[in-house]
A protein has these predicted regions:
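NAD(P)-binding Rossmann-fold cofactor-contacting core
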Residues: 68-82, 180, 195-213
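Short acidic low-complexity segments
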Residues: 91-101, 205-231
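Glycine-rich adenosine-cofactor-binding loop
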Residues: 40-54, 168-194, 204
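Histidine-anchored nucleotide/phosphate-binding helix
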Residues: 50-66
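Glycine/serine-rich phosphate-binding loop and adjoining beta1-alpha1 elements at the start
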Residues: 1-39, 72-173
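ADP-ribose/adenylate-binding Rossmann-like module
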Residues: 106-107, 117-130, 234-280, 300
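Adenosine-phosphate binding glycine-rich loop
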Residues: 11-27, 141-172, 260-341
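A short helix->loop->beta-strand "cap" motif at the edges of active sites that frequently abuts
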Residues: 64-67, 91, 117-119, 135-137, ...
Length: 341
């Protein structure tokens, strides 16, 4: 009964912000789990970044019978105005959780790798992998999936572009942008910047395959990096690696110049080499200045995968260490999204 009341409160708060077609995976998950109750009595700690569209992730968990606790970590961006709203609805919220008795932890960025849940963890991000790679408990890396690749590339790239425009930087035409890291996040940023007419240079490993019309700079060539940064309109970091920007020549050029600097990785890539005020959004991923950092249509199946990972952990069939989500599970949710389209 309590979960039903919380769900009603969440639905009332969300109102008509989103159309059902924007979250087919979570909607079907909630419908199915409200009947089967696969999480009845299961204590779940969820550290998905708290924003309005994240509230739709909680509905399937609550529908499934979970005892849900939300984690707020200083390492993970969130909308602080939602904390009192969640508490008023009866959802437990813990800030900087250092202890607790949980069955499953649905984590982001490895913020709760220090806790020991009964069944294991699901981790949303690639950066979180480095916090879990040596764990003796089962971990499902949601990031290691086609669904997450689509969200991270298209959703985060779109978020970068929307955030830049919200800050007034609307004209990319013939502007020089240098992107550090050409993984899933960097790929999306490059895609959207090129669509807007920017001249893009990419810093990554020698031999990295890059799109036509861009230029690759070796991450080991500090002279070339310094020269490119000196000429850049905007410098974007998307390596996902802590301190990745130390001693590569970029910081010195930025301190002497007027380049825009955007961080798009959850880890602190600049370390102590740049003051926070020199980086847009104070070195927090730039898309998190937006009310909707990643559009719901991109993040819906990813959040559904994070939820269903709890069921896989409860099965007891996931071995210790880092694991992929089962291919048939990912296909199930991908098919739901593709049918919507």
């Amino acid at each position: 009964m309590k979960n039903d009341q919380i769900i009603n409160g969440l639905n009332e708060y969300i109102g008509d912000r989103y159309q059902p077609c924007e979250y087919p995976a979570l909607r079907q998950q909630a419908t199915e789990w409200s009947e089967s109750k696969p999480l009845a009595g299961i204590r779940i700690l969820d550290n998905t970044p708290l924003f309005t569209n994240t509230l739709l992730k909680y509905i399937p968990l609550l529908s499934g019978g979970a005892e849900l606790t939300l984690a707020i970590s200083e390492r993970t961006p969130y909308d602080s105005s939602l904390i009192p709203v969640m508490r008023s609805l009866g959802i437990r919220v813990i800030e900087n959780c250092n202890q607790g008795d949980f069955d499953c932890i649905l984590d982001c960025g490895g913020s709760h790798a220090h806790l020991k849940p009964r069944y294991g963890y699901a981790e949303l991000t690639r950066s979180g992998y480095y916090h879990y790679k040596d764990t003796e408990l089962p971990v499902i890396l949601v990031d290691d999936s086609r669904i997450k690749a689509i969200e991270t590339c298209l959703g985060t790239g779109d978020g970068f572009l929307r955030a830049m425009k919200q800050l007034g930087h609307k004209d990319f035409t013939n502007r020089k942008i240098i992107v550090f890291g050409f993984g899933k996040v960097g790929c999306g940023i490059v895609y959207y910047a090129m669509k807007e007419g920017a001249e893009v240079r990419i810093v990554d490993e020698p031999g990295t395959l890059i799109p036509p019309g861009t230029e690759l700079i070796s991450r080991y060539d500090s002279d070339a990096i310094a020269a490119a940064v000196r000429q850049a309109w905007c410098v974007v970091t998307a390596t996902g690696i802590r301190d990745a920007m130390l001693q590569n020549g970029a910081a010195e050029e930025i301190l002497a110049g007027k380049q825009l600097v955007a961080a798009m990785g959850i880890e602190n890539e600049w370390g102590s080499s740049l003051p926070e005020e020199r980086i847009l959004n104070h070195n927090i991923p730039l898309n998190f200045i937006l009310e909707e950092p990643t559009r719901l249509r991109y993040i819906d199946p990813t959040m559904a995968l994070s939820n269903v990972a709890a069921l896989a952990l409860l099965s007891g069939k996931i071995p210790p260490g880092v694991n992929r989500i089962a291919p048939e599970t990912e296909k199930f949710y991908m098919d739901i999204v593709e049918m919507k389209d």
